[in-house]
C-alpha cells in the first residue's frame, strides 16, 4: 500500500494534521494504540488570558483564529457539539487587582477579551468580596468525545489501525532521504509522530530535552450552586 503519510498517534494534534492532509488531497494511514492519553484527560479549556497577572497568552488571539474554525468544521462534519463556549469570571482579591484589571482592558492584545466593567457576584455561595471581572472568547472543548468520534470515523474508512507502532519495523533510506520509507508492507513519503509525551520513548526524538507538564483539574460537588 502506497500512501503519502504515515501518522503515529491520533490526539488533537493528529486530528488537526489529518484534517489538513484531507484538504490537500493527501493520502495517509494512522496508527493509534491509545497508550498516550494526554488529549483524553485534558480539560479542554481555552483561554487567551493569563489570569494571574492579566497578561495575554503568547499568540493567543492568533491561535484562536485557527482553532475555533477548525472545531466548527469538526462539529459540522459529525453533526455534534464539541466547542462549548462559556465566559470566565475572575474573582478579584483586592482593590489593586481591580485597578490592574482596568489597566489590562486598555491593552490592545487584551481589550477584545476583557470586559471593562466590574461585575457583582451573582452566586451567594461564592466568596467574592471585591467582585469579579468577565473574560470573553473562552470555552471548553469536549476532547474525549471528539477524539473518540474521530477515531471511529477513520477506523470505519480503513484509515486507522489500532495497534502499537513498532519503531524497529520502520525502514528508512538514510542515503536517499526523499525516497519512500517502509513499514509493515506500507510505503510512504513521510512519517509524522503525533505522540505527545510519548515522544520520550521514540528512538528518533528521545534525545530532545523535553519535560512533561501537568495541570490540575478539581471537581467539586455543589448541588446548591446554580
Where are these regions (language model features)?
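N-terminal Rossmann-like FAD-binding beta1-loop-alpha1 element of flavoenzymes
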Residues: 3-29
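Short beta-strand/turn micro-motifs composed of small residues
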Residues: 9, 32, 92
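Conserved Rossmann-like nucleotide-cofactor binding loop
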Residues: 13, 36, 198
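Short glycine-/acidic-enriched loop or helix-start segments at secondary-structure transitions
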Residues: 17, 40, 100-101, 172, ...
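Conserved FAD-binding subdomain of flavin-dependent enzymes
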Residues: 20-23, 33-86, 99
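Flavin (FAD/FMN) cofactor-binding and adjacent substrate-gating region
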Residues: 73, 77-161, 168-173
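Conserved beta-strand-loop-beta-strand element in the redox core of flavoprotein oxidoreductases
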Residues: 165-186
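Central helical "cap/lid" subdomain
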Residues: 181-226
Amino acid at each position: 500500500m502506497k500512501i503519502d503519510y504515515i501518522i503515529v498517534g491520533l490526539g488533537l494534534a493528529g486530528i488537526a494534521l489529518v484534517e489538513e492532509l484531507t484538504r490537500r488531497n493527501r493520502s495517509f494511514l494512522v496508527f493509534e494504540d491509545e497508550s498516550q492519553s494526554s488529549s483524553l484527560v485534558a480539560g479542554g479549556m481555552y483561554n487567551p488570558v493569563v489570569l494571574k497577572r492579566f497578561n495575554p497568552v503568547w499568540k493567543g488571539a492568533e491561535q484562536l483564529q485557527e482553532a475555533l474554525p477548525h472545531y466548527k468544521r469538526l462539529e459540522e462534519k459529525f453533526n455534534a457539539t464539541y466547542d462549548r463556549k462559556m465566559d470566565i469570571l475572575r474573582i478579584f482579591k483586592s482593590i489593586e487587582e481591580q485597578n490592574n484589571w482596568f489597566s489590562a482592558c486598555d491593552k490592545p492584545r487584551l481589550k477584545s477579551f476583557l470586559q471593562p466593567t466590574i461585575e457583582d457576584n451573582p452566586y451567594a455561595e461564592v466568596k467574592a468580596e471585591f467582585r469579579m471581572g468577565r473574560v470573553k472568547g473562552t470555552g471548553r472543548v469536549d476532547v474525549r468525545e471528539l477524539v473518540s468520534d474521530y477515531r471511529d470515523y477513520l477506523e470505519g474508512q480503513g484509515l486507522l489501525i489500532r495497534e502499537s507502532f513498532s519503531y524497529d519495523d520502520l525502514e528508512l533510506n538514510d542515503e536517499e532521504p526523499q525516497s519512500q520509507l517502509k513499514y509493515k508492507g506500507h510505503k510512504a513519503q513521510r512519517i509524522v509522530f503525533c505522540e505527545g509525551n510519548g515522544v520520550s520513548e521514540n528512538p528518533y526524538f528521545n534525545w530532545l530535552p523535553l519535560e512533561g507538564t501537568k495541570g490540575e483539574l478539581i471537581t467539586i460537588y455543589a448541588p446548591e450552586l446554580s
